[in-house]
């Protein structure tokens, strides 16, 4: 309002670092005639001599160079766990329209937050391919909300992969979230094995080479995977050996549970712990 009242202007100048809020502003400006947007790549402007650019590429590496000099929002950000793999997914055209195949069951993989976001991936296993057809994320709502979302999507579900701590009973109700989900019709379930986070990350890396993503329905989940990164120690100026917890954690964790918790008969994934809970009242 302060700008509008005075017929003022706002200028946003920045360097890409994945498709974050700066990307959202830039993307919106491209389709709004009241905005002006421009991208000035070093290779286009001719301001810097070629030998200087070549030296920068050798020193910085391809991804950082693409961000800093070529204004790339697609380049892997520093410390990203899946930067290389997601770049390959993009370059090979595996982010596209991926329709639901009614002849194949849908597997969901959940990251259940307590007072935090809950994320769900929807996958179909067709031959060696893992097709991510949908993604959903929300916060501040109960489990009944997610059960309703699954019902409204009208997919035929084969299994629901849940984290191992879903079996812990809550103090307030004396029931586990597993029991609550079962009462809401979320069955059968697969309990993902309890593994080290690094092992799960490696499982996702191995799986991403076979993944296809629906560009529209999985957009936020795709960006979560692209930007999921190591925690950075600002004081020591080093990467810590653990993930940074932010908005990307939810989608990345749900993908990790999918990678370690479900085995398609045609795949080489490890055996899951499966429990059919139809008998729980």
Residue ranges and their predicted role:
Residues 85-102:
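Glycine-/acidic-rich phosphate or pyrophosphate-binding loops and their flanking alpha/beta elements
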Residues 1-78, 97-281:
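Short, flexible loop motifs at catalytic/binding sites
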């Amino acid at each position: 309002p302060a700008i509008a009242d005075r017929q003022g202007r706002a200028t946003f100048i920045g360097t890409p670092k994945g498709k974050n809020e700066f990307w959202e502003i830039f993307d919106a400006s491209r389709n709004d005639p009241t905005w002006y947007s421009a991208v000035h790549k070093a290779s286009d402007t001719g301001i810097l001599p070629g030998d200087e650019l070549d030296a920068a590429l050798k020193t910085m590496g391809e991804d950082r160079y693409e961000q800093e000099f070529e204004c790339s929002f697609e380049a892997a950000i520093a410390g990203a766990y899946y930067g290389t793999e997601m770049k390959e997914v993009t370059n090979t055209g595996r982010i596209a329209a991926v329709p639901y195949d009614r002849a194949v069951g849908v597997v969901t993989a959940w990251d259940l937050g307590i007072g935090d976001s809950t994320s769900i991936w929807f996958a179909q296993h067709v031959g060696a391919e893992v097709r991510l057809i949908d993604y959903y994320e929300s916060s501040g709502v109960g489990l009944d909300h997610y059960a309703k979302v699954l019902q409204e999507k009208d997919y035929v579900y084969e299994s629901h992969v849940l984290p191992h701590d879903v079996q812990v009973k809550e103090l307030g109700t004396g029931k586990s979230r597993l029991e609550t989900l079962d009462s809401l019709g979320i069955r059968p379930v697969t309990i993902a094995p309890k593994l080290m986070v690094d092992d799960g990350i490696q499982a996702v890396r191995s799986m991403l080479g076979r993944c296809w993503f629906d560009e529209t329905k999985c957009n936020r989940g795709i960006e979560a995977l692209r930007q999921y990164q190591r925690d950075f120690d600002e004081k020591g100026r080093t990467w810590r050996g653990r993930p940074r917890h932010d908005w990307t954690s939810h989608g990345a964790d749900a993908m990790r549970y999918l990678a370690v918790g479900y085995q398609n008969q045609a795949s080489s994934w490890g055996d899951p712990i499966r429990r059919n809970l139809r008998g729980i009242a």
